[in-house]
Amino acid sequence: MQWCRSQTNCRVFTDSCHIKACLIYNAADSFHQGTRKSQQYYDSAIRICPDYAEAWHEISVPYLKRGDFFTWRKYMDRAVALKPYPYLGTRGWCRWKFLRDYEGALTDLRRFDTLSQFHPSNSGDGTYNLYIVMALCERELGHYPQAFHYFSLGIDSVLAQQGDKWIGFLDYLHRAVTKMRISDYPEALRDLERQIKKYDNFAEIYYYQGLILHLMNLDKDALTSLEKAKSLAAANHHLSDIYCEMPDEVFMEDIDEAIDRIKKK
C-alpha cells in the first residue's frame, strides 16, 4: 500500500530554492515509494531547501512501513517542526497505529485539533476520523469518559452535521466494544445494530455481538452470532491490515474459544 499524495503546485513558491525542491519532490513520484531512487530525490530536495517540510515527511514514510521507527521519527519530527499543521495529525496517527504510543498520540492529536480549529480530519490511510483515533487512545488508557467524548465528536457530531455517509466503516463497532468493556450491554448492542446497517460483512461485528449476548445469558442467540462470525472469518471477511493488528480485530481461535466456552457451560 502506498499512501497517495497529490502533486504539489510549484507555482505557489516565489523563491528559486523552494521551486527547485518542489520540482524534484514531484519527480520522485516517477519511482516506487521507498526505492533508492525515490529516496535520493527526496534527499536532494531537502539538500536544496532544508525547510521543505513535505520532503522530510515523504522520506520518512518507507522507514515507518519497514519498522525502522527511530529513523522515521528523526525525519518526521523535522516535518512537524517545519509544519505542525498538518504533520502533527500524521505523526499522532502513526504513533497510535504503529507504536501504540497512546499518550504521545493524544499529545500530538490534541495540538493538531487546536491548530485545525477543531475541524475533524481523517487518518493518513483514510480509515478513521482522527477523533475516533483519539477515542481509541483514551480507551486503551482506561479513560472511558474521555473516550466517549471523542466518540461523540467523531460519530454523533459528524452524523448531525454531515450525515451517515461520513461515518467511518468501523466507528460503531469500536464504540460498541468500548461500551461492552464498561458493561453497558444494551447500548453496545444498539451500536452493533447501527454497524450492521452501515456495513455488516466483518466477523468482528458478530463475534462481539455473541460475547455480549452471552454476558446477558442469551446463549442460544450468542451461538447464532458466533457461528456467523466463524463463517465470515472463514471466508476472510474480517478486519486486517498489512502492517499492524487492528483495534478489536479477532481471529478464528478467538471465535472457536468463545463457542466452546458457551457449549461447555
Predicted regions: what they are:
Residues C4-H57, K65-D68, K74, K263:
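N-terminal leader/linker segments that initiate helical-solenoid repeat arrays
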Residues N9-F13, D43-R47, D77-L82, D113-T127, ...:
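Flexible helix-coil transition and linker loops at the boundaries of alpha-helical arrays
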Residues N9-S16, W166, L223-K265:
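Terminal, low-structured helical/coil segments at or just beyond the last alpha-helical repeat
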Residues H32, R66, F98-L99, L141, ...:
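Structural motif corresponding to the intra-repeat A-B loop/turn of tetratricopeptide repeats
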Residues A55, Y87-G89, N122, L130, ...:
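TPR alpha-solenoid repeat register
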Residues L136-K197:
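Alpha-helical adaptor scaffolds
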